[in-house]
Amino acid sequence: VVVMAGLAGWFAAGYIGTIVPLWANLALLVLIYATVYATSMIYASLKTVARWHHPLTPACYLMFAAAGGLLATLALLAILGLPITAALAQAAIVLMLSAWGVKFAWWRVASAARQAGSIESATGLAGMGAVRPLMPPHTEENYLQHEMGFVVARKHATTLRRIAVLLGGVVPVMLLFVAPASAVVLMLAVLVHVTGMFVERWLFFAEAKHVVSL
């Protein structure tokens, strides 16, 4: 979304005849990706969520930002009637496939991630065997329990992953192959991609396990 908003402003400037200097273009790109990276580190820096605490988390954010941003760029070029080169369309396909390749690697790493803490380590009784709490360490439900203790059945998570990949990657790539210069097709590709990314984002949060759920 940040990348798309930045691109929209860039195109708007060009559309009204404003010449954007090279340094301004580079500065815009740096600020956009710095924002994306900073956002990703909000999650990657949390040791309390093992699935997120990995270098591939910001890599996923940056790759999807690049892939979605270029796809949106192609759609805007087509809408404005500007030429779309084969190299741009091919780059969009490569970026999209690469982004999902990184995401598959993230899923594999996340599935193997284990919480750094346990009830035994939290109580300091790890050397005395298994520990079973008599009562919860809180008196009422809290935000973390609602937002970071969500349980998604494995079969549902697998289905949602397939939907995310299909809508967020496969369909947009197919549309790019079919009509890389059609405004209607490219707008559809952007819409489908964003829908798939919403599913991917929901899974990102729904599958996360905070140590509060021990």
Question: What function would you assign to each model-found segment?
Answer:
Residues 122, 210-214:
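Active/binding-pocket-proximal capping segment
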